[in-house]
Each structure stands twice: as C-alpha cells, then as structure tokens.
Amino acid sequence: MADFHIAPTGPLRVGVALGDRAWLDTPGDLVRVRAADLRGLTRKAAALREERPHVHALVDIDVMVARDAHSARAAMAAAPPRDGTTLLYVGTPVGLAGLIADIHALGIADGAVLIPLGRDGVIDLIRDEVLPAVRTMVSLHTETRLHTKTRESRTA
C-alpha cells in the first residue's frame, strides 16, 4: 500500500454544479477530482498535488439530501440511475457538511463541488443548511486549533 501525504493546503472551498455550470465560493486555480470512493479520491488528489502543487483539488460529490436520512434514501431510490464514477452522499445536510469538513481536515481534498441529484428542495437545503453548517464546522475547527496553539505557547 502506498503512503500518501495528507494535509490541508488552505481554506476549505465549496461549490455547486448544475449541468455544465458551476458556482464556486472562491476563485483560484481549482481542479475538480472525480472518484467513486474515498480511496480513489485520495490517490487522485495526491497525484494531482504532486504534478501541480499550486492547484487546489476539489472533489465532486453527487448529493441527495433531505431533512431526514429516510427521506433522502427514498428520493435516491426514485432518482434516475447514476454512472457510479463520482462519490455519492445520501443523507442529511449536517451529515454532508461533516463529510466535506472531514475530507478537508484530513487533507484529502481542499473542498468539494456538490452536484445535486434532485432539484426538489436539494439545492435549497445545500444553500440554507449545508453551506452554513460547513462554515460553522470549519470555524469551530480553526478556533480549537488556535486555542490549543495559544495554550501550548503559554506552557512553553
């Protein structure tokens, strides 16, 4: 098994793609990475960073969210079939926000481009619940790291 260097390379970035159009929260040299699972994503993002160290890797995630996991699974069962080449998340907005924050905190990717699989309410939930939850999680993680560093410097 290969070793991969994983570490966040900057602030978390999030975008939403609808068809051939994408909205991203920050400009920059961003490259979208597609993989069916986290292992493949880790490999592809590591290879990208080795080839092009100044770009930011954003993982594409097919998304089906609802207010509860049962409703999200039911909506996914009724959705058209997918090609299976993109990471898939089916669940709640908070769960999706946690996945995005974890992918960034572990240094697997610099963020995500969310691809809504259902239009009925999915885009609204991404805008109204996922994005604010991601901002809160990243803010809490940053504050915790700063608090820990401050405490360590006082004891040194």
Regions found by a protein language model. Give the residues of each.
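Active-site-adjacent structural elements that line small-molecule/cofactor binding pockets in enzymes
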Residues: 1-156
